[in-house]
Amino acid sequence: MNYAYPDEKGHYGIYGGRYVPETLMQSVLELEEAYKEAMEDEAFQKELNHYLNTYVGRETPLYFAENMTEYCGGAKIYLKREDLNHTGAHKINNTIGQALLAVRMGKKKVVAETGAGQHGVATATVCALLGLECVIFMGEEDVRRQKLNVFRMELLGAKVESVAAGSGTLKDAVNEALRYWVSHVHDTHYIMGSVLGPHPFPQIVRDFQSVIGNETKKQYEELEGKLPEAVVACIGGGSNAMGMFYPFVHDEEVALYGVEAAGKGVHTEKHAATLTKGSVGVLHGSMMYLLQNEEGQIQEAHSISAGLDYPGVGPEHSLLKDIGRVSYHSITDDEALEAFQLLTKKEGIIPALESSHAVAYALKLAPQMKEDEGLVICLSGRGDKDVESIKRYMEEV
């Protein structure tokens, strides 16, 4: 398969690009230049790997979920344990890389957006480590849902700005973070949390997250002597999925499955299934599939999981859908909750609600596969942050 994206203008087919105001263009170009240089610099790579190994705790285990496998019948189920990273999710793979890049560029301050709070915590964490000032924008609704993560960020020295505009969720937090970046661009780096935004952000985030798929490939071959037949990951903006999928894109014998949030059902207005129900548009500096109405107004995305309710999806996922290399599906709130409880009871692992969407789809997929086949789930994060809201949800039901 001939796959080499993005092109030199930052496009993935028709998607991606740089739809930014003139005031930001210079910074985006400067970032691209700095990033290219850093990736070719052995000292930078060495420093990054040092922190990934000794601070983040990589490599993360590839765990054979024997009880889940027995329960499902069919394929052997493996879990890539990104929940065991420092701060409890895949987010830190990207924040540590971008923070080192910020230091390299001479920036003193970092701004970021966060939905579930995981990216905010991971950003505040690396800023504490590297002595950078940190400002985090978070939607009002998410601040309510994720009180503990807000407190964590503040403990780590970050300033958390609550965003009341719009729906008070991730999309609005990104708007404010971009606005802040425009006016503080001389001394501030924006750490985008997913494979979104203007080029080079989708590429930078993908490359820093690719450690997930690269490790998985190596570990699976050591365990089974071949590549897995299927790989499953959840998708909000799509960074854990892109990090898992990208190293497998050329291995066409490996089926790739991305799982979005169907919320209350894709037949309702309350979902975040952008690739299933969306259409092409521009948001936050990039062309991608979006949830929008006929007038092109962005629609509210809904998911029980704060990390999946973004109304867009990364440009590279948009392309991978169009060319058919990745198969995209959606899972409802209820199905995700069921999978959350099942994995907890069967394996003693409490997954994040985001990751539970991937687990739920894998539960449908595994029984359709043969016993000598393997299925890897990217367990993108741990569920400590969700226990309170799940308790509330179950009491209401």
From Swiss-Prot:
EC number per UniProt: 4.2.1.20
Protein name per Swiss-Prot or TrEMBL: Tryptophan synthase beta chain
Function as written in the Swiss-Prot or TrEMBL entry: The beta subunit is responsible for the synthesis of L-tryptophan from indole and L-serine.
Pfam family for this entry, one: PALP
Organism field: Bacillus thuringiensis (strain Al Hakam)
Lineage: Bacteria, Bacillati, Bacillota, Bacilli, Bacillales
Domain of life: Bacteria
GO molecular function, one term: tryptophan synthase activity
InterPro entries: Trp_synth_b_CS, Trp_synth_beta, Trp_synth_beta/beta-like, TrpB-like_PALP, TrpB-like_PALP_sf
NCBIfam families for this protein: trpB (TIGR00263)
Keyword Amino-acid biosynthesis part of the UniProt annotation: yes
Catalytic activity: (1S,2R)-1-C-(indol-3-yl)glycerol 3-phosphate + L-serine = D-glyceraldehyde 3-phosphate + L-tryptophan + H2O
